[in-house]
Amino acid sequence: MTIYTFNLLVGYEPNGVDVAQASRALMLRELNEPAKFVFTTWPQPYKLDYYLSLGHRYEELLHAYLSFTDQDSHIPSLTVGALQQKFKLTRLDLKSQSETDSVYACSDGTFLVFKMDSYQKGCVRYVDYHVNGMLLKREWYGTSKLVTEYFEKGIIIRRSYHNKDGRIAFEELKQGTSWLYRLGTEILVTKTEVMRRFLARLPLTTADT
C-alpha cells in the first residue's frame, strides 16, 4: 500500500497545513508505511527548501509533471566536476566559488551559476544562465537534466520537462495570464486535464490511499 498526499498549496505562503502534512509524513515513515508527497506544480527553489526543511525527504517526493518523462530519479546527483565537464568548462572559466554556488564566465558573455543542493552534499541542484545581469534560463538536474525554465524579466514563461536523452516530453507555456500544456502532440488547456493524465499513469491499486 502507498499513501499519496497531494500538495495543492505550493504557490501559497507557509501555513499549518504544510506542517501537518510533514508531521504525517514522519509518522508514516516511523510506521514503515510507503508514502509519497505529490507536487502538483514544479516548486521554486525556496519552496523546495521549505518543504525539505519540514522533514520531507527527496525520495518521498513525487513531481506530477515529471511522470510524463522517462526520468528514474529527481534527486540531485551530479557534482560540480561532472557539470563542468558537460559544459566543457575549465578552471580558468571559474570566477567565484563558495559552499552554495560556483560562477563560470563563458566566452559568449553568458555567466553560468551552479547552485548547490543543501540536502545532497556535493551535488548541484540547478544551473542558472545570466546574460547582461539578467536571468534567462534555469536547468534543474537529477542524474540528468530534468527541467528547463525560461524567464522574461524575471518571470517564468515556459517550463520544459526532459526525458533522459534531453528530449522534451511535457511543457508548460504561459499565454498571457494563463497556461497551456503540451503533452506530445496534444495541447491541454486546463491543469485539471493534466492531473487526470497524471493520475492515469499512477500504478494505483485498491490498497492505495
Describe these PLM feature segments.
Residues M1-Q84, K164-T209:
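Long terminal segments
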Residues Q85-M195:
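Repetitive, compositionally biased segments used for assembly/scaffolding
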